[in-house]
UniProtKB/Swiss-Prot annotation:
Source domain of life: Bacteria
GO terms (BP aspect): isoleucine biosynthetic process; L-valine biosynthetic process
UniProt remark on cofactor binding: Binds 1 [2Fe-2S] cluster per subunit. This cluster acts as a Lewis acid cofactor.
Source organism of this protein record: Mycolicibacterium paratuberculosis (strain ATCC BAA-968 / K-10) (Mycobacterium paratuberculosis)
Name by which UniProt lists this protein: Dihydroxy-acid dehydratase
Amino acid sequence: MPTTDSARAADIKQPDIKPRSRDVTDGLEKAAARGMLRAVGMGDEDFAKPQIGVASSWNEITPCNLSLDRLAKAVKEGVFAAGGYPLEFGTISVSDGISMGHEGMHFSLVSREVIADSVETVMQAERLDGSVLLAGCDKSLPGMLMAAARLDLASVFLYAGSILPGVAKLSDGSEREVTIIDAFEAVGACARGLMPREDVDAIERAICPGEGACGGMYTANTMASAAEALGMSLPGSAAPPATDRRRDGFARRSGQAVVELLRRGITARDILTKEAFENAIAVVMAFGGSTNAVLHLLAIAHEADVALSLDDFSRIGSKVPHLADVKPFGRHVMTDVDHIGGVPVMMKALLDAGLLNGDCLTVTGATVAQNLAAIAPPDPDGKVLRALSDPLHPTGGITILRGSLAPEGAVVKSAGFDSDVFEGTARVFDGERAALDALEDGTITKGDAVVIRYEGPKGGPGMREMLAITGAIKGAGLGKDVLLLTDGRFSGGTTGLCVGHIAPEAVDAGPIAFLRDGDRIRLDVANRVLDVLVDPAEFDSRRTGFTPPPPRYKTGVLAKYVKLVGSAAIGAVCG
């Protein structure tokens, strides 16, 4: 008797919609676990439903995360509507804007690892079947995506959304649209006598008019755009601001989507392929996004067991043009990107040019190309986003460097460079504070190459962002005349001539450890080279007797971190 189509379909094994939570709901021996779950609201009929972890980095410390409490409620509505049972739990988030320029910044990057570890811990311990991961601050976005990649469950990422721009009324009667970066730059301008204190106060009061992440194409918005390009968040969800009620709709649909992923047996690593990471890199390059995206995408790929390297960034950046006129180097903010159609506009333009892989799977269950066809985004508007025929720069906004000063690599945000070559005289500082003091004293001048070392992942520890010094340099009017180099990081809001992630770092006896005041340093962006112009034999002789400084922290999370963290060239991952 021939087999019918319906019989064949019945023989196909359907994915288990409860692949893990049966460990806590099924069988006589799970009576105690069911009793605990009844206390949080589950009833008899709920034990047959998939359990979805709703992981949120909501807190009251920073405006970046304030909307997440509201969005988590909408996510849970979506999970319920799709036939799942949501269980919300929290994790930490560190505010880079508040922790910048002091000891607190040592704890920023390690928070990425703590977030990933904490989400993994809860998801594994409670045997949750899938997750919706909500984040709003710089390190919480990659931390959540790292957790998704590590766990390889059905997962959807949801961004909190960016803040609206503020408007400062200045002492000369003018009004100026401002973001948080303007405050850092105002400090430098005021210190040099270029701005009155009352204008600094006006900017301070205007930069954060409400909830949401910092508004330019800084790290949070860059990583939200990357998450959308990776396929880990719903199409069109990166750009709407935090206060926009469209976000509640995205939240509900994210809750529905994760249950549908379970029904279809789609997990995070089905989405997080090498081609998906290449799509994310292309979008970051075209936006001229934060250099932190290099560090974070390498780390997420590591968790997904995808071979991604700095060479991939170089390869993609060499063929993807810089198209977005967005802050910190441009004129516009994320709300402007939203007004002209959001990240799908950029993705469709890149797809049409053959610079994006349209076959990559996404959390909708459809491919990138199918999603974009359904949205039908408009063409770039020509102002916020340029057409590929009229780019701001012919190559991507981030350049990977190598050379005698960075054998393993370094990163520069080339979107802000007016010329390809800078040659300057080294001014060497062990730590950011000493460099800030020199700038305030007026001893950093045009033509200097300011070197800030022992700020790497191990040496810092924590690879601090150098926004305080870069903002002060720009505010002092030296943004185009002073080169800054570090084994630390830069904020997504950094502008100026800034080279970071220099590897190997100083504490690992990288060449940056042996620079001296007066050495000549040459940066050639077009040829992707960073060199120290000292006779190699003489420079090598400086290594004799090198001893790195002792660890700054002997207890606590950073003491553990130093023992585990790897080079910035591989994402500063721990293991």
